[in-house]
Design a protein with these regions (language model features):
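Hydrophobic helix-and-loop "lid/oligomerization" segment in the mid-to-C-terminal part
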Residues: 2, 9-136, 157-158, 209-429, ...
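Generic enzyme active-site microenvironment
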Residues: 83, 140, 163-165, 228, ...
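Short alpha-helices
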Residues: 96, 174-228, 600, 604
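Acidic, two-metal ion nucleic-acid-processing modules in DNA metabolism proteins
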Residues: 97, 102, 239-282, 286-334, ...
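Short amphipathic alpha-helical segments and helix-helix/interface helices
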Residues: 127, 151-152, 645
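Histidine-centered active-site/metal-ligand motif
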Residues: 166-167, 356, 414, 504
Length: 690
């Protein structure tokens, strides 16, 4: 079980009926009603698909100054540079603005810092190199808001800066020609949650005043990819950008984007925000993480189909390399975490010289999810460390870093994700203070890992392929409009098996005579504490699986636990069986409840002789124990049967092998009479009870 608690709301039946009567499908109605939508008018508003952005870009502070300075550079033939970031938001921002400026005939170059050599944001070395190449105006995208010193240095070289960013601002802003950031305290722009690429799009729309519709149509797909990848709130203008971007992806003029979609296997339509976030974006991101962001930028801007195919293959290969490096760092980070005292586990602060700087951020995300706390991963080099951190439970990282700023060289980012630089000697003090800060702001006990379920599916027969396909009406998903979570309670786990080198689980569930196929990524059966035959509660996303042109319903599992319904007594007994057969011990209470009598040993042996035989039997544990317990009564007979098996094995009558959820039994008796009373295990049990 991944989550300590599931929040399952009561079904608002009246609202569901109202929405279904208005023509909305059952699943869509159930999700909307669970989220407070109770009338057809509210539903229409929630599902409305806007085609234009709501606010003028000139509502942003300094947008007029940015447009004036860039327009002057275009008129005078100045050399410009677009200075971006190496994540997907930064890469798409860089490509969007560069493509537009080139369409205006600008002499423009791109600069995306190499993550390892240069690090995040503006750098004086890069500014000097750009100046020496003749650049007189640098426009930043998705970075620059904390570049006070770098902006001042650029001024000494005669280089102007226009800063566009969407990160949190510090008290002092850079003294640039223009600083465009909706998070500026004095910025009146109504929507504060644009991605960096959203701000870049607004700049282009302002520069191309009078051609807004055509420019939005050209660039909304790039803007959608960056917005999804940066996990921005999926509401307001972000929702419009992503909806329009996904709808127009087939019509996009960007040759490289189509090549990457094909190479990533995204050939079916329509493309969803989930596919962008979990399939396409990681491949673009891999270029930046592995220090090759320029490859992704070249791919998105190339018009050469042959070059695009080659670059797309390279990005997919970089992503596979990133996955391998990530898994190794994750394993070693857990090993390091296990050496920390309990007082240093409210916030995980881990460091190593061996960790790839480009991958520590994604590992921090996995650690936060696994251990339910903020995580800080630091790559060390030459006495200094570059860190990436991820939040948990809404904890504000930016404020936490600000509280520890005297220990840091620099920091920046958002509430939920941030980066920082720290001297290696300060890491122990930083670890201590950050743990104290987290406890002070969350209490001594970390927040309980909570799974918010939208819909408890009471009527499995209503879950049809058409119903699942209709869930696309709720797209695009993201923060503020999460992908809906469903659950089935008291379902039977018909089968479970490892796939993908046993890194994932493939399973079959059944409830009310309706069968479902499911996949559970990055989890083993032992980690779930379940086996075939158990009654379980399953939480999942509903999706359509397409294989060899056949479409079917698939459950993408989020969590799986032994059923908490009244029949859970059976699961409790089975859990004890697994413990016993794995060589564990029982409490005196459990032993007393299930200690077999002599007659029960005899009956159990007869069942084994009849059902197992010399060739053995290998089956999922629960069905096998049910079968062998056929002459006994009550759920506790699972445990009693397991105790019989254990004693028989100890006395050389039986061999037992357990692998994951499968039990293999073979009779090994040679016909000699065996005294069960001499079993050390049985003697120990009698000792417990005497």
């Amino acid at each position: 079980m991944k989550y300590e608690h599931w929040q399952i709301p009561a079904a608002p039946e009246d609202a569901i009926k109202t929405l279904m009567d208005a023509g909305y499908p059952y699943l869509v109605s159930s999700v909307l009603a669970a989220r407070g939508v109770t009338t057809s008018e509210q539903a229409a508003e929630a599902l409305e698909r806007e085609k234009t952005l709501a606010y003028s870009p000139f509502l942003m502070k300094d947008m007029d100054k940015a447009v004036a300075r860039i327009s002057k550079a275009l008129e005078n033939g100045e050399k410009l540079a677009v200075f971006g970031d190496y994540d997907v938001d930064g890469i798409t921002s860089t490509c969007l603005l560069t493509d537009y400026l080139r369409s205006r005939g600008a002499d423009v170059t791109m600069h995306i810092p190499r993550r390892i050599e240069e690090g995040y944001g503006l750098g004086c070395d890069a500014i000097r190199a750009l100046s020496e190449s003749g650049v007189t105006l640098i426009v930043t995208v998705d970075c620059g808001i904390t570049g006070v010193d770098e902006t001042a240095y650029a001024a000494t070289l005669g280089v102007d800066l226009v800063i566009t960013d969407h990160h949190e601002c510090k008290e002092q802003l850079p003294a640039a020609v223009a600083v465009v950031d909706p998070h500026r305290p004095d910025c009146p722009y109504p929507f504060k949650h644009l991605a960096g690429v959203g701000v870049a799009l607004k700049l282009v729309l302002a520069l191309g005043e009078g051609r807004e519709d055509a420019l939005f149509a050209r660039y909304c797909t790039l803007a959608a990819i960056g917005t999804i990848a940066d996990v921005m709130r999926m509401e307001g203008e972000n929702r419009t950008i992503v909806q329009c971007g996904l709808e127009s992806i087939d019509r996009s003029d960007f040759t490289g984007l189509h090549a990457l979609l094909r190479e990533a296997g995204l050939t079916s339509r329509p493309i969803s925000s989930i596919q962008i976030g979990f399939v396409l974006a990681p491949r673009i991101n891999a270029a930046g993480r592995m220090g090759r962001a320029e490859l992704a930028a070249e791919l998105l801007l190339t018009g050469d189909p042959v070059r695009a195919e080659k670059l797309a293959r390279e990005l997919c290969e970089l992503n596979r390399e990133r996955q391998s490096v990530e898994q190794d760092i994750f394993r070693r980070a857990i090993e390091q975490m296990e050496d920390l005292p309990e007082s240093e586990r409210s916030a995980l602060v881990l460091s190593s010289e061996d960790w790839h700087q480009g991958v520590v951020g994604i590992v921090a995300s996995r650690l936060s999810e696994k251990f339910s706390c903020p995580s800080f991963m630091i790559h060390l080099s030459g006495g200094s460390g570059k860190g990436s951190c991820r939040s948990y439970g809404g904890f504000n990282l930016f404020n936490a870093l600000e509280a520890c700023s005297d220990l840091l060289v620099s920091f920046g980012g958002h509430e939920l994700a941030a980066g920082f630089t720290i001297e290696e000697r300060n890491i122990p003090a930083f670890r201590t203070r950050m743990n104290q800060y987290v406890r002070a702001h969350t209490g001594e006990h970390p927040p309980v890992s909570m799974l918010d379920v939208d819909v408890d599916l009471q009527h499995p027969s209503l879950i049809t392929l058409e119903e699942v396909e209709a869930l696309s009406l709720l797209e695009p998903y993201g923060a503020g409009n999460n992908r809906p979570v469903f659950c089935l309670r008291g379902a039977t786990l018909e089968s479970v098996q490892g796939v993908g080198q046993n890194r994932h689980l493939k399973l079959k569930l059944q409830k009310s005579r309706v069968n479902f196929d499911g996949i559970f990524f990055s989890v083993t059966a032992d980690e779930c504490g379940v086996c075939a035959g158990m009654r379980v509660d399953a939480a999942f996303y509903l999706q359509v699986n397409e294989f060899r042109s056949q479409r079917s319903i698939q459950l993408q599992l989020i969590d799986l636990r032994p059923s908490l319904d009244p029949s859970g007594r059976e699961n409790e007994a089975l859990s004890l069986c697994r413990e016993l057969i794995s060589g564990g011990t029982l409490s005196p209470r459990d032993a007393a409840r299930a200690l077999p009598s002599r007659d029960q040993f005899v009956r159990a042996w007869r069942v084994l002789e009849r059902e197992v035989g010399p060739d053995g039997v290998s089956e999922p544990m629960l069905p096998l124990l049910r079968h062998l317990s056929s002459e006994m009564v009550g759920a506790e007979t699972f445990l009693r049967t397991a105790m019989c098996l254990q004693v028989f094995a100890e006395r050389g009558l039986l061999s037992i092998e357990r692998k994951d959820t499968t039990l293999t039994l073979r009779l090994t008796a040679d016909g000699k009479k065996v005294e069960l009373d001499k079993s050390p295990y049985l003697s120990a049990l009698h000792g417990f009870l005497s």
